[in-house]
Amino acid sequence: MIDWITSQGHAIFGGAWTPLWILIRAVLIVVPLLLCVAYLILWERKLIGWMHVRLGPNRVGPLGLLQPIADVLKLLLKEVMTPTHVSKGMYLIAPLMVLMPAVAIWAVIPFQAEVVMADVNAGLLYVMAISSVGVYGVILAGWASNSKYAFLGGMRAAAQMVSYEIAMGFALVTVLMVSGSLNLSAIVNSQNTGYFANMGINVLSWNWIPLLPMFGVYFISGVAETNRHPFDVVEGESEIVAGHMIEYSGMAFALFFLAEYINMIIISTITALLFLGGWAPPFSSFVTNAIPGFFWLLIKVFLLLSVFIWIRASFPRYRYDQIMRLGWKVFIPLTVGWLIIVAIWIKSPWNIWH
């Protein structure tokens, strides 16, 4: 289908088709992503409401389904107030510096076989590099606001994100070792081969079983990376109000939240691709194989996002020193140890990957 569209595009538009096709693919990623964020926020409010034995939003539209539209309109109509004491240029560019890396990562994310904007061989390296850039926007927001609360929140965010990126990096290196590729599509395909996959039990051939500690560390570190509860000391309401976002309002404030929810979707998608078989069904059969792979990936991402929300509803916020201790004294030693174990496992006669 995609090859046919490409050939027809070249025939109709000639040399102008290549940049036009890039633009079309970017729009096809960004627009659904914005809709997903809007309804992820609604799902979060609904799910937490059910966990609290209440209804959640149910007034705007049938079953509250138009609530995200109302929220967007409210934010668009709010005035963006710029305090006089801020460093205006850096203050205004900080939300964009947080949002842009979150959107840029989607260029290499495959949605199913051969459905990806840029199928680069170093896709995993690209993800690691781009995901670490967002912290600069957070630091800049804290510093440019010229507020001690914002600056303290920015410093907390920087330390937390850098600390947990190390553990996430080791987890990704382990996936690289067992799959033998930095290409995200190749990593997914490598999980759907082997003894159990040949029997049709794909779920037992995915990386989540042999790399279970890495699976847990990566996902929990992802929760910390996105500054979500219980790792949200960056915006601890009882201590520093909204942290680095305290001087922002209106749509500028909304951009930080947009980046946060996009990062949640990114962490869930990458976790599904690296550890849960990507777009492969859990069991191979005539019925499951007839369902497009994109829907299987969507189901896995939805379940992981629901875990994000469940964690928020269930756990108290950690103290800052507890978060740092977990990252440096538990996760990093655990990932290094499992990395060594997997390296020995690969070289042993019991190698299950190659």
From Swiss-Prot:
EC number(s) recorded for this UniProt protein: 7.1.1.-
Subcellular compartments: Cell inner membrane
Transmembrane segments: 22-42, 91-111, 124-144, 168-188, 203-223, 255-275, 291-311, 326-346
Keyword set, alphabetical order: Cell inner membrane, Cell membrane, Membrane, NAD, Quinone, Translocase, Transmembrane, Transmembrane helix, Ubiquinone
GO molecular function annotations of the record: NADH dehydrogenase activity; oxidoreductase activity, acting on NAD(P)H, quinone or similar compound as acceptor; quinone binding
InterPro entries from the UniProt entry: NADH_UbQ_OxRdtase_su1/FPO (IPR001694), NADH_UbQ_OxRdtase_su1_CS (IPR018086)
Reaction equations catalysed: a quinone + NADH + 5 H(+)(in) = a quinol + NAD(+) + 4 H(+)(out)
Membrane topology field: Multi-pass membrane protein
Pfam families assigned: NADHdh
One annotated Gene Ontology cellular component of this protein: plasma membrane
Major subcellular site: membrane
GO BP terms: aerobic respiration
Subunit structure: NDH-1 is composed of 14 different subunits. Subunits NuoA, H, J, K, L, M, N constitute the membrane sector of the complex.
UniProt family annotation: Belongs to the complex I subunit 1 family.
Purpose of the protein: NDH-1 shuttles electrons from NADH, via FMN and iron-sulfur (Fe-S) centers, to quinones in the respiratory chain. The immediate electron acceptor for the enzyme in this species is believed to be ubiquinone. Couples the redox reaction to proton translocation (for every two electrons transferred, four hydrogen ions are translocated across the cytoplasmic membrane), and thus conserves the redox energy in a proton gradient. This subunit may bind ubiquinone.
Name the UniProt record assigns to this protein: NADH-quinone oxidoreductase subunit H
Lineage per the UniProt record: Bacteria, Pseudomonadati, Pseudomonadota, Betaproteobacteria, Burkholderiales
Gene: nuoH
